[in-house]
C-alpha cells in the first residue's frame, strides 16, 4: 500500500488516467450486461453495443491522432467540415494551406514539445505533457481567430469523411475545444461503422460470427475508433459481403433494385482504395439463375463495372497516370534503398521487369 501511495505521488497523471479509464470501463460493462440479461437481444443489437462500447474505450485509451495516418484523415475531415459550414470560399490561403481555427493549431503543431522549428503532431509520441493537457482540457474553446495547417488532405471521395466531418461541424457550432472536436469526429466515425456493421450482421445469412470476430480484432477497433476512413471502407465492405450472400441464398428473384444497391456501394467504396475494387468480383458468386431474367444479370455486371471504373478514374486519375506512365520525380520501390526525396510509387514497367521485388 505504501508503494502504491508513493507511485501515486510520483506519477499522479498516470494514476488519474488509470482511474478514469477504469471507471468508464466499469460503467460500460455494467450497461452492456444490463441490456444483455434484462432483455432478449438479437446478435446485431449485441454487435452494435459491443462496437460502441469497445470503440469508445479504444478512443479514450489511444490518444487522438495516434492511429496510422490519422492526422491526414483529420485534415481531410476538417476541410469537408468547413465546406459543410459554408466556409468553402475561404478554405485555403495562397499557398494551398487549409484554414483552421486558432484553437486547433495545437493539433498538428504542438508547442509542448519545446521544438518551435518542428511541427509535432499531437498524439504521435505520447508523453506526460500530452496526457496532462487532455486531462485539463475544457469542453469549450479557449482561443479565438484563425490560422493555417501545413498538413494536406487526402484526395479521395468526400463520402469517406462525411461522418467525421459531421462530428467536427457539431463541435465547431458548439465552439468546442480541440479535444471536443477530435472526440466528436471519432464518435461519429465509430457510430457510422457500428450502424452499417449491425445491418451487415442482420442481413448476412451465414458467417455472422466471423464478421463479429473480425470487428473485434485490435487493429479493427483502433481504426474504427479513430478518424481513419478505414472505418468507412470496412463498414461498406461488410455490408457488401452481407448483400452478396443474401442475394445468393434468398428465395425471391433478383431485380433492378438489388443491382442499384450494389452499384451505390461500388460508387461509394471503389474510389477510396483501388485494391478494394477487386472485392466486387465476389458478385460472380450470385448465379444468373437468381435473376428474373438472364439479360438482367449481364446488364447488372455491366452497370456494376461502370460504377467501379468511373468513380475510380474520376477520383484517382493522377495516381493511375503515375502507375501507367511514371513521372520524372518518381522513386520506384526497387531503387528507393539509400535514396531520399521524390515520390514513392509503383508502375507497370517496374512490376513487369522485376516481379520478385514486388
Please give the residue ranges for each predicted region:
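Short acidic/glycine- and proline-prone juxtamembrane loop motifs at membrane-interface regions
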Residues: 226-233
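Start-transfer (signal-anchor) and selected internal transmembrane alpha helices
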Residues: 10-56, 296-304
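Specific aromatic-rich, kink-prone transmembrane helix
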Residues: 199, 234-250, 262-265
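Transmembrane-helix signature of polytopic, membrane-embedded enzymes
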Residues: 41-45, 176-179, 198-218
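Interfacial juxtamembrane loops and adjacent helix segments
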Residues: 84-183, 333
Amino acid at each position: 500500500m505504501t508503494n502504491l501511495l508513493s507511485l501515486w505521488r510520483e506519477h499522479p497523471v498516470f494514476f488519474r488516467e488509470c482511474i478514469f479509464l477504469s471507471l468508464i470501463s466499469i460503467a460500460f460493462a455494467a450497461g452492456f450486461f444490463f441490456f444483455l440479461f434484462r432483455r432478449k437481444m438479437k446478435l446485431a443489437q449485441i454487435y452494435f453495443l459491443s462496437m460502441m462500447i469497445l470503440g469508445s474505450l479504444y478512443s479514450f485509451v489511444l490518444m487522438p491522432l495516434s492511429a496510422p495516418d490519422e492526422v491526414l484523415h483529420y485534415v481531410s475531415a476538417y476541410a469537408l467540415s468547413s465546406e459543410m459550414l459554408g466556409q468553402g470560399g475561404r478554405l485555403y490561403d495562397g499557398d494551398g494551406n487549409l484554414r483552421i481555427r486558432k484553437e486547433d493549431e495545437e493539433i498538428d503543431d504542438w508547442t509542448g514539445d519545446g521544438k518551435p522549428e518542428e511541427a509535432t503532431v499531437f498524439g504521435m509520441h505520447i508523453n506526460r505533457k500530452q496526457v496532462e493537457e487532455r486531462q485539463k482540457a475544457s469542453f469549450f474553446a479557449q482561443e479565438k481567430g484563425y490560422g493555417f495547417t501545413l498538413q494536406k488532405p487526402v484526395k479521395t471521395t468526400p463520402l469517406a469523411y462525411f461522418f467525421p466531418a459531421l462530428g467536427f461541424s457539431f463541435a465547431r457550432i458548439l465552439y468546442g475545444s480541440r479535444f471536443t472536436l477530435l472526440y466528436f469526429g471519432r464518435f461519429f466515425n465509430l457510430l457510422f461503422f457500428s450502424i452499417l456493421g449491425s445491418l451487415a450482421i442482420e442481413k448476412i445469412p451465414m458467417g455472422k460470427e466471423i464478421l463479429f470476430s473480425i470487428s473485434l480484432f485490435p487493429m479493427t477497433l483502433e481504426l474504427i475508433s479513430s478518424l481513419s476512413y478505414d472505418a468507412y471502407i470496412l463498414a461498406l465492405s461488410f455490408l457488401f459481403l452481407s448483400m452478396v450472400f443474401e442475394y445468393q441464398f434468398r428465395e425471391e428473384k433478383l431485380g433492378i433494385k438489388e443491382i442499384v444497391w450494389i452499384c451505390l456501394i461500388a460508387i461509394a467504396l471503389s474510389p477510396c482504395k483501388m485494391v478494394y475494387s477487386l472485392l466486387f468480383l465476389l458478385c460472380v458468386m450470385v448465379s444468373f439463375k437468381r435473376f428474373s431474367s438472364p439479360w438482367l444479370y449481364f446488364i447488372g455486371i455491366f452497370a456494376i463495372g461502370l460504377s467501379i471504373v468511373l468513380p475510380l478514374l474520376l477520383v484517382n486519375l493522377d495516381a493511375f497516370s503515375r502507375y501507367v506512365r511514371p513521372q520524372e520525380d518518381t522513386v520506384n520501390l526497387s531503387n528507393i534503398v539509400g535514396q531520399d526525396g521524390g515520390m514513392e510509387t509503383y508502375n507497370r514497367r517496374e512490376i513487369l521487369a522485376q516481379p520478385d521485388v514486388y
